[in-house]
Amino acid sequence: IMGYGKIDPDIEADILTLKANPYPTYTFATHLVEIEIDEELGALELKRVWAAHDAGTIVNPMGTEGQIEGGVAQGLGQAVMEKVVRENGYVTNPHYRDYLLPGAKDVPLEIECILVGNYDHTGPYGAKGVAEVSLIPIPAAMAGAVTSASSIQPTHLPMESEYLLRLIERRDEEKL
């Protein structure tokens, strides 16, 4: 069996003003997280995630949920672990023994995927992409949860223990 398909998305670009709508469709997502922060150690743990995604027509619900769960794991890594260390223009942690990624113990057991299926006329069968968009909300949701839980406001990633401890110490000094 052989098939052929073509899509001609309605995208616009104005070369004079440099304004464009480069994508035929957009996926929307929002995440809510429950965290636990140990203020003595600066340890941050992601306990639960609620992930709502408008992915168009959901063609494969189990596959879609798997993509979202994988994105949550990637977002967790970006939020608290992944840090490129440079010295004199060279990366000094180019190996996985030095560049940390989340493992099975780090990812929360409870990830509730809320699939919103709004048909999209430009996607195949009305579907939209869901993979990468699922990692984007996690760092911001976790930073917001840290602020809500401890009255500190992280401003950069990753939110490592040492960094959170400095923020906690600064908060406590300001209270005196």
Predicted regions and their residues:
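Cofactor-binding beta-sheet edge motifs in enzyme active sites
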Residues: 1-176
